[in-house]
């Protein structure tokens, strides 16, 4: 699946995109791997570099999602992502200058652990296509990056996504019709 979302970190807009690969067990529980990319227009001034910076984060990990009402066209699910990643700042000049290239080092990033529970409505469009819409809350470990007023990337994200796969929608592919 692929998803995108809009949220907020420290009062500023945050944009998120994600990918996930999962196995759906008995149409009731999804288990797999998910990864997310987050960008937030923070415009934090860095005195040592004399520039304004924005926040970026990349994290991924174990994806668990119990699914209720799995035999219906509309399902309710409770996704949970448990994982780790990196958070850092980048010069916001790249938004305005196509020729700008920034050299990033390991000092520009800090490790972060993330737990991201949520609630989704899943819409079965066809046997191979599902659309999801929902809300998640991101809990993170503390980060320590200069120049920061942000110590965590906690926050709500509302998003939509699309899942492609084989969704049986209540059909048993192994059951034979006997006449």
Question: Residues of each region from the PLM?
Answer:
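Short glycine/proline- and aromatic-enriched beta-strand/turn motifs that initiate or cap beta-hairpins
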Residues: 1-26, 163-179
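Outer-membrane beta-barrel translocator domains and adjoining extracellular loop/strand segments
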Residues: 12-14, 43-48, 88-97, 143-150, ...
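Residues that define the transmembrane beta-barrel architecture of outer-membrane proteins
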Residues: 13-17, 54-60, 74, 109-115, ...
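Predominantly the C-terminal beta-signal and adjacent terminal strand-loop region
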Residues: 122-179
């Amino acid at each position: 699946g692929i998803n995108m979302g809009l949220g907020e970190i420290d009062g500023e807009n945050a944009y998120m995109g994600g990918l996930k690969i999962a196995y759906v067990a008995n149409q009731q529980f999804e288990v797999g791997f998910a990864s997310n990319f987050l960008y937030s227009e923070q415009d934090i001034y860095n005195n040592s570099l004399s520039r304004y910076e924005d926040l970026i984060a990349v994290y991924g990990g174990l994806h668990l999602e119990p699914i209720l009402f799995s035999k219906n066209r509309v399902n309710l699910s409770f996704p949970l992502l448990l994982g780790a990643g990196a958070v850092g700042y980048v010069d916001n000049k790249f938004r305005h200058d196509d020729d700008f290239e920034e050299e990033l080092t390991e000092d520009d990033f800090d490790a972060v652990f993330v737990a991201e529970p949520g609630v989704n409505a899943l819409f079965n469009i066809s046997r191979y296509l599902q659309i999801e819409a929902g809300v998640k809350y991101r809990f993170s470990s503390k980060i320590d990056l200069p120049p920061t007023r942000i110590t965590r990337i906690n926050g709500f994200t509302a998003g939509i996504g699309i899942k492609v796969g084989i969704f049986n929608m209540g059909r048993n592919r192994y059951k034979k019709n006997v006449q």
